[in-house]
Design a protein with these regions (language model features):
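Substrate-recognition "cap/lid" segment bordering the active-site pocket of phosphatases
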Residues: 104-156, 187
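Short, Lys/Arg-enriched N-terminal segments with co-localized hydrophobic residues
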Residues: 1-9
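Alpha-helical substrate-recognition element adjacent to the catalytic core
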Residues: 11-122, 126-127
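Alpha-helical segments flanking ligand/cofactor-binding loops in enzyme cores
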Residues: 87, 147, 166-167
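Acidic, Mg2+-coordinating phosphoryl-transfer loop and its flanking beta/alpha structural elements
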Residues: 95-100, 154-195
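Short, well-ordered alpha-helical microsegments
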Residues: 103-107, 165-166, 201
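Short, acidic/turn-prone active-site loops that include or flank metal/cofactor-
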Residues: 120-125, 180-184, 198-200
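Short amphipathic alpha-helix with an adjacent loop that forms part of the alpha/beta core around
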Residues: 203-209
Length: 209
C-alpha cells in the first residue's frame, strides 16, 4: 500500500549508560583498583579532555595497561535490574546506548547487559597494551546522535542522569531524567524524573502511544 505521511511513527530510545545502567566506571574502577585519585569526575574537572589525559597519566604511573584495566572492569556489575530492564525495553523499542566512555572499557559490562548497541568513543592502545590516547567520536555526541537519528526518520525518546544528557533529553520527543541529582531535578522541573526501572519503562511505553 502507499505510505501515508505521518501515520506510523518509528521510535528509537537513547539511553545514557553510566549512572543509568552501570555504575560510574571510573569511580568503580578507582575502588576496585585501590587508586582513589581516579574518583575524580567531570564534576571535579569539567574539561573532559584534560580529565582523560590526567587519568591516562595515573594509569601509566601505576603501570596499568588495557588488559589489567579490563580485568578490573570485569569485576564491576551492571546496576541491579539493568539487564532485565534493557531486555524488556528491547521487546517494544529499538534502543541505542550513548556514552562518553570508551568501547574498550565498556566491553566487559556490555557482555553482562546482553550486548546492546553502544555508541561511544575509542582508545588508542599501543601493542604492549599501554593506553596512549583516545579518540572522541564527535563533539557533544549525545545531542548529535539524537539529531542524526531524527534526520533519518526516527522520533527519539531519551533518558539520562547528568548535565551532558540534557541536550538529548530536551531535543527528543520525550525525555526523562533517571536517578539524577537533586540539583538537576530542581533546575529542570519540567523534565519528568524517575528512580526505578519499571517507572521508566512505563514512561517510555506511554511516550510511544
Amino acid at each position: 500500500g502507499s505510505a501515508g505521511k505521518g501515520i506510523i511513527t518509528m521510535y528509537i530510545t537513547c539511553l545514557d549508560v553510566e549512572g543509568v545502567l552501570v555504575p560510574e566506571i571510573w569511580i568503580a574502577f578507582a575502588e576496585a583498583s585501590g587508586i582513589p585519585e581516579l574518583k575524580k569526575t567531570t564534576r571535579d574537572e569539567p574539561d573532559y579532555d584534560k580529565l582523560m589525559r590526567w587519568r591516562l597519566g595515573i594509569l601509566k604511573e601505576h603501570g596499568l595497561g588495557l588488559k589489567e584495566i579490563q580485568a578490573t572492569i570485569e569485576k564491576i556489575d551492571p546496576l541491579p535490574g539493568a539487564r532485565e530492564f534493557l531486555d524488556e525495553l528491547r521487546t517494544f523499542s529499538q534502543v541505542i546506548l550513548i556514552s562518553d566512555t570508551f568501547t574498550e572499557f565498556a566491553a566487559p559490562l556490555m557482555k553482562k547487559l546482553g550486548y546492546p548497541t553502544l555508541f561511544c568513543n575509542s582508545l588508542e592502545v599501543a601493542d604492549d597494551g599501554e593506553i596512549t590516547g583516545f579518540k572522541m567520536r564527535v563533539e557533544q555526541s549525545k545531542l548529535t546522535t539524537v539529531k542524526a537519528l531524527q534526520s533519518i526518520g526516527f522520533e527519539t525518546i531519551a533518558s539520562g542522569d547528568s548535565y551532558n544528557d540534557l541536550g538529548m533529553i530536551q531535543a527528543s520527543k520525550a525525555g526523562f531524567l533517571f536517578r539524577s541529582t537533586d540539583k538537576i531535578k530542581a533546575d529542570y522541573p519540567e523534565i519528568p524524573a524517575y528512580e526505578e526501572y519499571d517507572e521508566l519503562l512505563t514512561a517510555i511505553r506511554n511516550a510511544m502511544k
